[in-house]
Amino acid sequence: MLQPKRTKYRKPHRVSYEGKAKGVKEINFGEFGLMALDGAWIDNHQIEAARIAMTRYMKRDGKIWMRIFPHMAMTKKPAEVRMGSGKGNPEKWVAVVKKGTIMFEVAQVNEQVAREALRLAMHKLPIRCKFVKRGEN
């Protein structure tokens, strides 16, 4: 699964996913992309499931770029544990996705195949998304 090799801090503060994206707002590598219409924390399993769905539909033709990576550890305390006594242990790795972020890019396939592959990926993600073309957004 996707996770960083090393982190400076084991238990980071929870970064907000409210507001608009600052960095990854345009398609830079491929011809078509998947843009987030909401903000959310997307975990490594969801990113991997979306990638596998696209790869299988395209039958390994074309090229896929993942523009998000789960850098942040989410912590959770065990069930039925009283409050206090420190922060919980790292449970999963998440990517902070804000509104307008391009999450995946696809190239070297026609638009119909790209649209269907990205539609399948949308169903694996917990947020609303839309299909965009290069230069359109």
Curated annotation (Swiss-Prot):
Spell out the NCBIfam families in the cross-references.
Answer: rplP_bact
**Record's function text:** Binds 23S rRNA and is also seen to make contacts with the A and possibly P site tRNAs.
Native organism taxonomy: Bacteria, Bacillati, Mycoplasmatota, Mollicutes, Mycoplasmataceae
Gene Ontology biological process terms from the UniProt entry: translation
This protein's name: Large ribosomal subunit protein uL16
Per the UniProt record, the source organism is Mycoplasma mycoides subsp. mycoides SC (strain CCUG 32753 / NCTC 10114 / PG1)
HAMAP family in the cross-refs: Ribosomal_uL16 (MF_01342)
Q: Provide the disulphide bond pattern.
A: none
Q: Which PANTHER family match?
A: 50S/60S RIBOSOMAL PROTEIN L16 (PTHR12220), LARGE RIBOSOMAL SUBUNIT PROTEIN UL16M (PTHR12220:SF13)
Q: Family assignment? A: Belongs to the universal ribosomal protein uL16 family.
Q: Which Gene3D superfamilies match?
A: Ribosomal protein L10e/L16 (3.90.1170.10)
Subunit notes for this chain? Part of the 50S ribosomal subunit.
List GO terms (cellular component aspect). Answer: cytosolic large ribosomal subunit
Any one GO MF term held by the record is: tRNA binding
InterPro entries reported for this sequence: Ribosomal_uL16, Ribosomal_uL16_bact-type, Ribosomal_uL16_CS, Ribosomal_uL16_dom, Ribosomal_uL16_sf
> Which terms are listed as keywords in the entry?
Ribonucleoprotein, Ribosomal protein, RNA-binding, rRNA-binding, tRNA-binding
